[in-house]
């Protein structure tokens, strides 16, 4: 059995938490996040910690409590520090540039690709071959980065495409005659 739910989430200074039934709102320096948690979880705030527990008589209550704890912990980290994903474009002529609230990509297609950014997500291009996606919602930052990567995933022979900065692309050997 996982014991994730047994550890309380510590609320750092400068972060405000509001509980309204199963809805939790966390406000901090980087923004505000709201989430409705599963009914199988009992949430309570004690001083500067949030404690999670299972509701009696629910089969998978401990699993749901662990999931809720992980989600709330990510919300607290997000509004306090924020999350970042870095992407690298590798290939001849592959470029990225900001166009207002969208990322413009040149990825070898016959047309340029523009990806509009959702609210709460910021992106910047320090160089033409790098994209840095930042925001306070971990799930949304990861989803935007995955969407940008999906336009041209790294191919296995030369490794060309859009990749995460920490991603290792395994390359295959070309077919021999």
From Swiss-Prot:
Record keyword Coiled coil present: no
Keywords linked to the UniProt accession: Ribonucleoprotein, Ribosomal protein, RNA-binding, rRNA-binding
Stored PROSITE patterns: RIBOSOMAL_L6_1
GO biological process, one term: cytoplasmic translation
Sequence intervals crossing the membrane: none
MF (Gene Ontology): rRNA binding; structural constituent of ribosome
Name of a matching Pfam family: Ribosomal_L6
Cellular component, GO annotation: cytosolic large ribosomal subunit
SUPFAM superfamilies linked to this entry: Ribosomal protein L6
Keyword Phosphoprotein: no
Described purpose of this protein according to its UniProt entry: This protein binds to the 23S rRNA, and is important in its secondary structure. It is located near the subunit interface in the base of the L7/L12 stalk, and near the tRNA binding site of the peptidyltransferase center.
Listed HAMAP family: Ribosomal_uL6_B
NCBIfam families hit by this protein: L6_bact
Assigned protein family: Belongs to the universal ribosomal protein uL6 family.
Self-association and partners: Part of the 50S ribosomal subunit.
Name of this protein: Large ribosomal subunit protein uL6
Lineage: Bacteria, Pseudomonadati, Pseudomonadota, Gammaproteobacteria, Vibrionales
